[in-house]
Amino acid sequence: MKKVMKIIGIVLLCIVALVVVLIVINTIKTAINNKRVWIPDDYYTAFESDSALEKKYAGLGEYEVKELEFDSENKSIDKIRVWYPNEAEDRQYPVIVIVNASNTAALNLKPAYARLASWGFVVVGNDDRQTGAGETASETLDYVLNLNKDENSELFGKIDEEHIGCVGYSQGGAGAINAVTKFENSDKFTALFTGSASYALLSKNMGWEYDVSKISIPYFMTAGTGSSDDAGNSEIHSNEVFAGVAPLASLVENYDGITADVFKLRARVTGAEHQDMLHLTDGYMTAWMLYHLQGDTEAASIFVGENADILTNNGWQDVEKNK
C-alpha cells in the first residue's frame, strides 16, 4: 500500500511539475510575443474594396515617416511612440492619439501607425495594454504637446494643436470615448473614431464606464457584423447574456445618445469579425481624420450628403448619419 501511495505521489508531483513548466513556457512565449510586431510592413496591400476612395485611403500617403520613442514614468504606458512626416519643411501637422485594444501595444502595430502618419499626421501611441479608462491616452496627449513646446525636441513646433483626433479599438474604443470626455485636456480633441468599442454595460463591468452624451466632436463609430462583435441577441442591458463586443444595438444606442448638433456616423463592416476591424476600417478611418483634421474635401465626400461614398459601398452596412 505504501508503495502504491508513493507511486501516486510521484505521479502527482510530476504532473504538478509539468503544469508549472507549461505555465513558465507559456509566460515566456507571451512575453516574447508581446515584444514583437504582429503585422507586416505592407499589411495594407492586402486590402480590397469596391470603393476607389476607400482603397486609396487604406494605402500609403505621400510622406516619408520617422519614428521616435520615449520612456514614460507611468509603468502602464511604458513607452510613448510617435510617427510623423520626416520633412525639412517648416510646418505643423495634426495629431492623432491611438488608444490600444486589450492586450495590444503600439509596439505590436507599428506599420499601422506609420501608414497613418504617411498621410500627414503626427501619430501617437503608447504600450499600455489596458486602456479602457482613457487616462493613459490623456497623459500621452499631454506628453506629446509638451514636446511641441520643447526647443530641444525633434517635434518642436511641428504639432497643430488645433486639430487633434482620437482613434480607439475594442477596449480602446471605450478608452477613446473617455479620453475625449473625462479629462482636463479632453476639450483639445476635435475628432473621434472607434472600431468595435465595447458596449456600455460591458465597459462598465470592466471598469471603463463611459458617457456618450458628453461627446461634442464629430464621431464615426464602427463595428463588424461577425458574431464576435454581434452575438445576435441584442441583450446589451443584461449581465446574463454576452451580446458580443460591439453589437448593432450598442451602436444604435450610442448614436442616439449623442446630441443632434454633433456630426455623428455609425456603420458596420459587412462580414468583419472583431479582430478584423483595424485593417478593414483603415481607409475610412484615415479619410475621417483627413476630413476633420486637414479639411480634405475629397475625404469629406465619403461621409457627407446623399451621395456619400459610404452609402454605396457594399463592404459597409447599417449606415446612419446626420449630415
Question: Model-found features: residue ranges?
Answer:
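Short amphipathic alpha-helix adjacent to the substrate-entry channel of hydrolases
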Residues: 107-126
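Hydrolases whose catalytic domains are alpha/beta-hydrolase-1, hotdog thioesterase
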Residues: 175-179, 203
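Alpha/beta-hydrolase-fold serine-hydrolase catalytic core, especially in secreted/extracellular enzymes
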Residues: 2, 29, 33, 270-323
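Short beta-strand element of the alpha/beta-hydrolase
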Residues: 90-101
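Gly/Ser-rich "nucleophile elbow"/oxyanion-hole loop immediately N-terminal to the catalytic nucleophile
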Residues: 87-92, 135-174, 182-183
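The feature captures the conserved acid-bearing segment of alpha/beta-hydrolase catalytic domains
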Residues: 190-277
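N-terminal cap/lid segment of alpha/beta-hydrolase-fold proteins
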Residues: 35-91
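N-terminal Sec-pathway targeting helices
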Residues: 1-20
